[in-house]
Regions:
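PAPS-dependent sulfotransferases, especially Golgi type II membrane carbohydrate sulfotransferases
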Residues: 1-43, 213, 220-364
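Pre-Walker A (Motif I) flank of P-loop NTPase domains
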Residues: 45-48
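Hydrophobic anchor at the beta1->P-loop junction of P-loop NTPases
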Residues: 51
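P-loop (Walker A) phosphate-binding loop of NTP-binding proteins
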Residues: 54
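A conserved segment at the C-terminal end of the G1
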Residues: 60-73
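PAPS-dependent sulfation machinery
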Residues: 78-175, 245-250
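Short catalytic-loop micro-motif centered on adjacent basic/acidic residues
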Residues: 174-178, 291-294
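Conserved phosphate-donor/acceptor-positioning beta-strand/loop module used by diverse small-molecule
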Residues: 178-180, 189-214
Length: 364
């Protein structure tokens, strides 16, 4: 998505209005429950599927696979910019509903998107209830998700997304999201969402780090050229790259790493990868609710039955969407400035994750 070409003056004004009216949107969300109570009453509360991991690990492809079935409903670009009251916005915007052609997204990675493509907007809801968590230069790991009203608001929100997608003639029953920052909420998110199934893809650490560094440089340049692009990504809680970069501070890794280089260096992303996936591995015993998926295996378009069993859905629904997965082109990588001990640690961790991957099991 090219921000300069995709968002005109009126679009940008509308987005700025939405970005500055979070609390008003929460009020409108309450109004939605009254206005659309008949629609919402027909949506059962079934366990959500939450896809999370460091970016560039296959989370988008997984989201597209799930959202492309008749079973799951996800946010789409049409829910922007009033993400917290999507049914009202969808009703108001319907008379001027735009058609558009698929185009490559801003990452320039070959993934084609349109206004009807699924996207990661869930973090807007978390930001509305926990604004204090986003005020530092890093994102802290959440020790708890306690909030008097959050769990109900989350449940209500997922039902709205299911109801909204049904308006398009589909019949989804469950909510699915991609949200990289949910990695920071493992295992606390199960306190609020005990029935959630969490999928965490992971990737070869060197190739993953190279991809992360490349995207950081790309978005840093984009944000310098177009402040709206930076503001847009910040508003939806995407702190992955560029001027918005705020890494999740797993176990205080940022301050605990002597001589940590900046994010323009591969070693930075190797260290981040280690911190993130060591955190995941620590909580992998939550095997009934947390499933690990190796990126490289997804690229082979394997039988997805083990993933379907993990999230309790019909295997054919997922297997019919395997075309969304493809092998990534390898990056040429210079490892001369990465400490060998870090590389050894990352590779050992990768092997430990691989041994626990859903797709290496027999699907039972």
């Amino acid at each position: 998505m090219n921000f300069e070409n995709q968002y005109g003056v009126l679009d940008r004004l509308l987005h700025r209005l939405a970005f500055s009216t979070t609390q008003a949107q929460l009020g409108l969300a309450d109004l939605e429950k009254t206005l659309f109570r008949k629609e919402l009453r027909r949506v059962e509360e079934l366990r959500p599927v939450l896809i999370t991991g460091l970016p560039r690990s296959g989370t988008t492809a997984l989201l597209e696979a799930f959202a492309g079935t008749q079973v799951f409903a996800a946010h789409t670009y049409r829910d922007m910019p009033f993400v917290l009251c999507p049914m009202l916005w969808g009703t108001m915007a319907k008379p001027v509903r735009r058609r558009d052609k698929p185009r490559e997204r801003a990452h320039a990675d070959g993934i084609q998107i349109s206004l009807d493509s699924p996207e990661a907007f869930e973090e807007v809801l978390w930001k509305a209830f926990f604004p204090q968590r986003y005020r530092g230069s890093t994102i802290p790991v959440w020790e708890d998700v306690a909030h008097r009203d959050f769990e109900k608001a989350f449940r209500d929100h997922t039902r709205r997304i299911v109801a909204l997608r049904r308006r398009a003639g589909r019949h989804p029953r469950r909510y699915v999201s991609k949200n990289n920052l949910n990695l920071a909420r493992i295992p606390a998110l199960w306190d609020a969402l005990p029935d959630a199934r969490v999928l965490v893809p992971f990737r070869d650490p060197v190739q993953h780090a190279a991809s992360l560094r490349h995207q950081h440089a790309r978005f840093k340049e984009m944000h310098a050229k177009d402040p709206f692009a930076r503001r847009y990504m910040e508003a939806i809680g995407h702190y992955d790259f560029g001027a918005n970069l705020r890494p999740i501070d797993f176990d205080g890794w940022v301050d605990a790493t002597p001589d940590l280089p900046g994010p323009e260096h591969l070693a930075y992303w190797i260290r981040y990868w280690i911190a993130a996936y060591r955190h995941v591995l620590r909580h992998e015993p939550e095997r009934k609710r947390l499933g690990l998926i190796r990126f490289e295996t997804l690229g082979e378009r394997p039988d997805l039955t083990p993933i379907a069993h993990h999230v309790k859905c019909e295997p054919n629904d997922l297997n019919n969407r395997r075309r969304h997965f493809r092998a990534a082109r390898p990056h040429e990588v210079d490892l001369s400035h990465v400490p060998s001990a870090w590389l050894d640690e990352a590779r050992e961790l990768y092997e430990q994750l691989s041994a626990r991957c859903l797709l290496t099991r027999d699907g039972t």
